Amino acid sequence: DPTCKHFGVCGGCKLQNISYHTQTELKEDKIKHSITRIFNDAKINPIIRCDNQFFYRNKLEFSFTDNKWLTQEQLDSGIDFPERRGAGFHIPGFWDKVLDIDECLLQPEPSNALRNFVRDWAIERDMPFFNARSQEGWLRTLMIRVASTGEVLVVIQFKEEHAEAREELLKELAGKFPEITTLQ
C-alpha cells in the first residue's frame, strides 16, 4: 500500500503503489530502452538504490491556487469546502488544477512546515492565491531547497505586488525558520 495519503491524486509520486525494488527495475528498464534505441552498444550501469525512498529530494516546487482540487472522497463527504485556497502539486494532466497537500514524503523538514506556514499565513490575511486561468493572484509558487548541511533556500514567486504583506511574510518566515539561509 502507498505510504502517502495523497497518492493516486497528487502528481508528486507515481509508483508508490509498488515496491521500491520494482520501481527502480522499471526505471532502469526505461532508461536502457531509451538509450539503446539511439546507441545500440551503450553500456548502462545498474541503478544504485537509495537507503531511504522517502525524504530524499533536495528541491521541490509547490503551486498556489485559489481553487484547490477536491478529491472524490471530499466531494462524497457532503461537507462544504468554502475555503478553496491551497498549496501543493498539480493534478497529473491538468495545468490548472492543484491538490492542496499538508504532508509530502519527498522532501525532509522543514519543507512541509514551510509550505503549510506560507499557505496558512496568507489565508489568515485573506491574500489572493494564484488563478492559472486568469493569471491573477498574489501567491504563485514556492520553491524549497534543503541542503544536506541543513541549510534551506526558499524562493516565493509573487504575481501581484503587495509590498507590505510580502515583507511581513518574509520577515516572519526568517524568524520562524532559522535554518533558512536564503530567502527571496
Q: Predicted segment positions?
A:
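Accessory RNA-recognition modules of RNA-modification enzymes
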Residues: 1-184
